[in-house]
Amino acid sequence: MVASTKRKRDEDFPLSREDSTKQPSTSSLVRNTEEVSFPRGGASALTPLELKQVANEAASDVLFGNESVKASEPASRPLKKKKTTKKSTSKDSEASSANSDEARAGLIEHVNFKTLKNGSSLLGQISAITKQDLCITFTDGISGYVNLTHISEEFTSILEDLDEDMDSDTDAADEKKSKVEDAEYESSDDEDEKLDKSNELPNLRRYFHIGQWLRCSVIKNTSLEPSTKKSKKKRIELTIEPSSVNIYADEDLVKSTSIQCAVKSIEDHGATLDVGLPGFTGFIAKKDFGNFEKLLPGAVFLGNITKKSDRSIVVNTDFSDKKNKITQISSIDAIIPGQIVDLLCESITKNGIAGKVFGLVSGVVNVSHLRTFSEEDLKHKFVIGSSIRCRIIACLENKSGDKVLILSNLPHILKLEDALRSTEGLDAFPIGYTFESCSIKGRDSEYLYLALDDDRLGKVHSSRVGEIENSENLSSRVLGYSPVDDIYQLSTDPKYLKLKYLRTNDIPIGELLPSCEITSVSSSGIELKIFNGQFKASVPPLHISDTRLVYPERKFKIGSKVKGRVISVNSRGNVHVTLKKSLVNIEDNELPLVSTYENAKNIKEKNEKTLATIQVFKPNGCIISFFGGLSGFLPNSEISEVFVKRPEEHLRLGQTVIVKLLDVDADRRRIIATCKVSNEQAAQQKDTIENIVPGRTIITVHVIEKTKDSVIVEIPDVGLRGVIYVGHLSDSRIEQNRAQLKKLRIGTELTGLVIDKDTRTRVFNMSLKSSLIKDAKKETLPLTYDDVKDLNKDVPMHAYIKSISDKGLFVAFNGKFIGLVLPSYAVDSRDIDISKAFYINQSVTVYLLRTDDKNQKFLLSLKAPKVKEEKKKVESNIEDPVDSSIKSWDDLSIGSIVKAKIKSVKKNQLNVILAANLHGRVDIAEVFDTYEEITDKKQPLSNYKKDDVIKVKIIGNHDVKSHKFLPITHKISKASVLELSMKPSELKSKEVHTKSLEEINIGQELTGFVNNSSGNHLWLTISPVLKARISLLDLADNDSNFSENIESVFPLGSALQVKVASIDREHGFVNAIGKSHVDINMSTIKVGDELPGRVLKIAEKYVLLDLGNKVTGISFITDALNDFSLTLKEAFEDKINNVIPTTVLSVDEQNKKIELSLRPATAKTRSIKSHEDLKQGEIVDGIVKNVNDKGIFVYLSRKVEAFVPVSKLSDSYLKEWKKFYKPMQYVLGKVVTCDEDSRISLTLRESEINGDLKVLKTYSDIKAGDVFEGTIKSVTDFGVFVKLDNTVNVTGLAHITEIADKKPEDLSALFGVGDRVKAIVLKTNPEKKQISLSLKASHFSKEAELASTTTTTTTVDQLEKEDEDEVMADAGFNDSDSESDIGDQNTEVADRKPETSSDGLSLSAGFDWTASILDQAQEEEESDQDQEDFTENKKHKHKRRKENVVQDKTIDINTRAPESVADFERLLIGNPNSSVVWMNYMAFQLQLSEIEKARELAERALKTINFREEAEKLNIWIAMLNLENTFGTEETLEEVFSRACQYMDSYTIHTKLLGIYEISEKFDKAAELFKATAKKFGGEKVSIWVSWGDFLISHNEEQEARTILGNALKALPKRNHIEVVRKFAQLEFAKGDPERGRSLFEGLVADAPKRIDLWNVYVDQEVKAKDKKKVEDLFERIITKKITRKQAKFFFNKWLQFEESEGDEKTIEYVKAKATEYVASHESQKADE
């Protein structure tokens, strides 16, 4: 019966399981109203909830249309069987509102992997963007991934086009890649391919941003797949394509509907969009999208419909409007995530609110999205039947197949705020952080909610709660953050709280792992469990061991524990570990490890060494790996000082090498390293290897690497490496040596004998054989044939077997000195095979057999010769005892009191003799009983002198080698050195007593004597067997001058009274403090106290000092430096850990801060405490605090700062002025204002510091009667406003009645804005900032006019004088070079920085940018004509040049400088051919920022100046080049340059532009132009090559300059070779490497020995180099040449002048004698002829 009913139901309801967009079944409430038409009573029989449902269902009837009765009839049937079955369909459940429990069972309150079926749609935020996909996070912290192919159709088409391009360009890409690999390196070949490919893919960060909201649809959930297909990791794959997530009918596209859009194209006023709906296109205006300029075709975003017309939709991205909600839908398919809807509240429980949307789809708002966790509060806040405005965040399918919703009422979700809240949340409390005190806020079906503080909430999943003992005070740990829910994800489970790290990404790079469990071993690496099995890690093959293991499984057993270190953790959380001892056992303080590029930069800046591993070999070097997954490149040239052809020959894969970093470029992901040591260390290594004597030198080394058969060692602090072969580890058998090799640890210190060395490769061989070491110490180990030939045949010699052959055993004493043992002298029987009986490096004892003096060869024997026993020598008796009572050795024993004679008095002991053959010593601690007995505390033994006889007591023996006290254990003999005491108490006592550690107590007072100093400690001798250590800070005498040398304050042997602070029984000494020492603390230190402090750290701004007793103080830079011109590093670098005197400036006991001064009383830079210590015009020292856009702030002291505005920084115009001033830079300035501490200003202008201070006047400074020049600011009907010069933007009004004596009619006809005028002040009103001016001529008296004229003339004269001084200074500079003729070069060899602005064009009133170029041109023209003639004095030529320059400077300058356009035009009428006037006119326009007018003037000048005036035209062209270089573009400069080359001499124009580039510091441009000029004129012009060489050497490119010399010799004809080489040699002497210059000159004088002028120039350069010996040697060589008498006279005079300047009287006489001898010899030769 039941079966038939079900069958019939299926037939009657064929559409019952179809799409739910069909008309819903009629509610039972509706039928009830039809059946009961007239209910009793006047009120409605329905509850408010039922009324709301009726209204919703009526709306749905209208929405779907009431087509026929058939649709309603079958819908009513299931009601009859509602109670007979629990498995009702979704429509049945929707129709049944009475069974609320059953309805709630179909709801989904939380999202998890099990509820996200394919087709589920969600609203989420982008939480991460990678190269391959987007990571989108939803509610409850679940994340999914969007692949590149599921973004949009437009984006997919971009990928398809890219794929086609990649296929077509494969060959080109391969070729390009090979070129790149030749030029530089990448990390590995595999990574190359990945990087190349990923670099070509579109960068998703340009299309999307973190925090962006998107609607997504699930296309794959691996956790729901069958077990056969199930992957190891759960992963949700999503699509955000509009066609997949926008499920709308035409009727649903109404205002406020959220819609996902993809950008199709960018238009002028907006972007066209793809909305994924057939027949519809979208549009968004520019103004409606925040960063429209960043919008790209293919990008996807969530929009809000604002308008719909026909087939187009207009959207925006504003979701903040509270009215943005949908009120109608065409079907339930339109209810999708992202929409704002009204949820009809049906039930309220402790888990949240359940209800319906549009009366069709059930939904729930969880308590975490209501932020109300109590059921009572929920019922108080919300009422059943009310509507709640929510946004849908998930649309899922329940087990019955029904559509259910998860909604949110959180404000940030309603507004869709773009900020990703997890960023801020995890910045505050990162993953792994533990909250100690949390309170329970509430709970629902899956989560426990905790209150972390007033603002933050967290939730704990039921699986991570654990056992809660105290619910009021919980500890929880952060596991993550859910940005959509705005809530922390926590765990209260104790096992999570105890973990050190929660994720592998939290494990720091370089972490030492003491106990790693091996889980598998293979050739591809080792798998480990770390942190007690919490994480897995892998060991790459190259990091298994320092030595290559063929069978790693033999050494590393599964289940065993090993020690490792984390080398990297990749983005997926995979941990890589190294087991190499060289990396595992490295201490943090030994070598810093590279783990990040920032870390690498710090290591490079500090010039420190680090460790790297050889990863891959390349032809031009090898790729090395660091920690953190970083790779670097080690070029062949940097592997070793010797030439390296193939890196495999010098290194091996997986080898750990110590490197220095040459270049770190984080942007290019590039690190260049070197194994080569620095030049200083290379020199040190060279000296060390040369000083090593094989067979004699014993050194201490550290083990840095182990191989199968040897140990690699290194000399500390030198870096020289050597090898100890396993056979040389001891004299024992090879088996024992191999066992010893295994026990050796990296870093172990060894002492051994060098037996061989290679000075070329700087490598040595060592031996640890004790037999060889002992012989070497005794110097009995033979090194040469002479050491062997005279030995007796019974003398044993220790050696080792070098090699074995048929001839016998070749036995070596060191690597080069070898003898032969014949087989018959090696073994007893010929049947024994010596190759099996012996092995290489075996220790042997040999005896001399035969020698061959002729060939210096010798034979040895392993068999000892038979020798007769010698008779035992009888020991002699005691000789000449000092104490006559001593007759024999038996009279001397422990406790004996005897007389002794002082042999010598040392600072800390008395050396005595008891007999002629018996010596002893009295330690200073055994002289005095008490401190008071000592008269001279610094030299206690000064009262004793040589040959004094003293009474002493024998207390023990003294070990001469170890300098230690030894008890007497055998009979005293002449070999003994006795330890004696002369203490009065000891002489009286019958017992022998020496103060030892056992009888010392803490607090006991002792007398100690300084034995030595070590760093910041003194070592004291308390007794011969007891030492004490005392810190300098713990000495009682705080007045000690610690700035002096410690040895002078506490000399050796000086006496101190100390107290025992602690006892170090392990090392056998006591720690002491001064007797009157008081432990300092914050409460005892007062301002003004002078305390000793130990320098701990030098920072950029301060010095940190240790005052003792864990009290530290800080000395600010202005309180630390005696001279501000030094940096803290320069002043205190050599004082780190030294104790220096300090003065307390302030004590902040609350913040535990002490400020100190390190400045002496007579500091070079005076102390400034407030503005009262300053006065205007005073010059002060300062240190730059910081730099901002308005100027720089300067420290004058710790509390006083000053400000320097940009206008006061420099006399020159500095375009990029900020790069000239850095924090903590020293500056010298002059005080401008100092009214208050907060209003101190300085000027750094050199002209104002050295001259008068130009203080701009303000309204309050101006008085009636003052005369000013100014500029017309504006012209009105009632007067003109004038901006006054030399004021702070002061403007005054000249009324129309004060313009002229006769009132003008039209002011605009007389004046224009910018005209220059002179005005007199009539009256001022500073309060209102008003000034009345007059321009009337009658107001200016004759005296005023005269004064003004005088002032103007004086100013002009000063300018001329300054210019003249500059030119004279330059000329004088050249004149100083004239003796060596280097001043005649086209290129000045000395530092030639021109006194012009850095831009190449100065707009100052002086206007010097044309004349200086003109001077330069004249100098170059004249220099080409000069020849190297040593006999001609050329100073007159320079003098004439100076006069010409001055004359050019003053030509055509009137007594009054032109001040307007009219003035210049008037000047041009009289001087149309004067380039100076034209250029001044151009400069005037440039001052007014009229650049285009300046260009027009230049063109006018070229047309106006007569064609014969080439020099004047040249000046205009140069001015145009200057103008375009400063104010134009590259194109305009190139155009002017090309034209100038056509009209003027091309070479001259090239050289002028080169000069302009250098002056304006455009060095790259200059380098390019040098190359082009040399190519064009290099075959005929020597000067261009010299200029190019000068340019390169000036910029520290000496090697490139030497290449240029080679190119010059190829390009120039042979006749010019000597000249160009000579000039390059002069350049090397002046700016480069003088040794290189000498080499060039030596080559010249060798090729042309008769060119005396070359010898003259050579001498001049050596004189400038100030190497007296070389100058004298050169003169000696010259006078031996065949030279004329005139030339000889010249050189002798020159030599004599040199020696007189040196003041060497002895050499002066020698030169005179040499000259006399020369004259005499030539006179005799002449007479003979």
Curated annotation (Swiss-Prot):
SMART domains: HAT (SM00386), S1 (SM00316). Residues 78-88 have a biased composition (Basic residues). The modification Phosphothreonine is found at residue 47. Residues 8-21, 173-182 have a biased composition (Basic and acidic residues). Residues 1-45, 64-101, 166-196, 1344-1403, 1417-1444 are annotated as: Disordered. The keyword Oxidoreductase does not apply. PROSITE patterns: S1 (PS50126). Residues 119-200, 338-410, 510-580, 607-676, 690-769, 794-863, 895-971, 1003-1083, 1088-1159, 1177-1245, 1265-1336 form the S1 motif domain. It holds the Pfam family S1. Involved in the biogenesis of rRNA. Required for the formation of 18S and 5.8S rRNA. This is rRNA biogenesis protein RRP5. The lineage of its organism: Eukaryota, Fungi, Dikarya, Ascomycota, Saccharomycotina. The gene is RRP5.
